[in-house]
């Protein structure tokens, strides 16, 4: 069983490769790369629970765990609906140091683009604000190898951790937390994992 969720039908047949795939698909990690603990979040940019996590709980985790050097945090794509894969592609196509900012913008403006009558036009608007012109945006969302790479990240989460919904979190490649749970649940799991 795969996680395609119909995403394969959205992949263009023979789009140009204007994106550096090695850079675009490399892991997106914040925090000390040598931190003793690791948390990976499988998220969809069209998921309202993911947006809520990032607006609330993530800020506290970042302050208490990431910024203190105890945790490295990895963003892993798991697009759930059609336009989400384009949003993930857009985020991965910006420079690596702008990725987290683009994720913030896409999650904070989620209601504007994810539920729009024409979500691709709304994503193009966000791209323009970020300095990405229409032609470049079209190249990004039609880049089949980039889109396939994003699907492979999600598929690996499904195959390895049975990830089927977002947000889902893997702590130290051992424990899985599913859903937008509060900070206290993360605190308990992180404290347990750190001992």
Spans of features found by a protein language model:
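N-terminal export signals
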Residues: 1-17
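Proteins that catalyze or organize thiol-disulfide redox chemistry
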Residues: 18-22, 193-195
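A short beta-strand-turn-helix
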Residues: 20-37
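Extracellular/periplasmic catalytic domains that process cell-envelope and extracellular macromolecules
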Residues: 33, 66-68, 162-164
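Short active-site neighborhood of thiol/selenol oxidoreductases, capturing the structured segment around
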Residues: 34-51
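Soluble periplasmic/extracytoplasmic beta-strand elements of cell-envelope proteins
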Residues: 38-41, 72-75, 168-170
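Structural alpha/beta surface segment adjacent to cysteine/selenocysteine redox centers
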Residues: 43, 51-128
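C-terminal cap of thioredoxin/glutaredoxin-like
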Residues: 44, 125-195
């Amino acid at each position: 069983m795969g996680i395609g969720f119909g995403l394969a039908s959205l992949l263009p047949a023979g789009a140009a490769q204007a994106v550096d795939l090695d850079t675009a698909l490399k892991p997106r990690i914040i925090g000390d790369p040598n931190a003793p603990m690791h948390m990976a979040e499988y998220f969809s940019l069209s998921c309202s629970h993911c947006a809520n996590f990032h607006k609330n709980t993530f800020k506290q985790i970042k302050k208490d765990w990431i910024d203190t050097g105890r945790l490295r945090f990895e963003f892993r794509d798991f697009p759930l609906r059609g336009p989400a894969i384009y949003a993930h592609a857009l985020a991965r196509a910006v420079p690596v140091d702008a990725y987290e900012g683009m994720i913030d913008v896409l999650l904070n403006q989620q209601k504007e683009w994810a539920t729009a009558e024409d979500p691709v036009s709304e994503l193009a608007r966000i791209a323009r604000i970020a300095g990405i012109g229409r032609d470049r945006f079209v190249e990004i969302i039609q880049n089949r190898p980039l889109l396939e790479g994003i699907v492979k990240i999600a598929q690996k989460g499904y195959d390895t951790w049975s990830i089927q919904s977002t947000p889902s979190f893997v702590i130290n490649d051992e424990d899985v937390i599913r859903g937008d749970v509060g900070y206290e649940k993360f605190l308990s799991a992180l404290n347990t994992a750190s001992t």
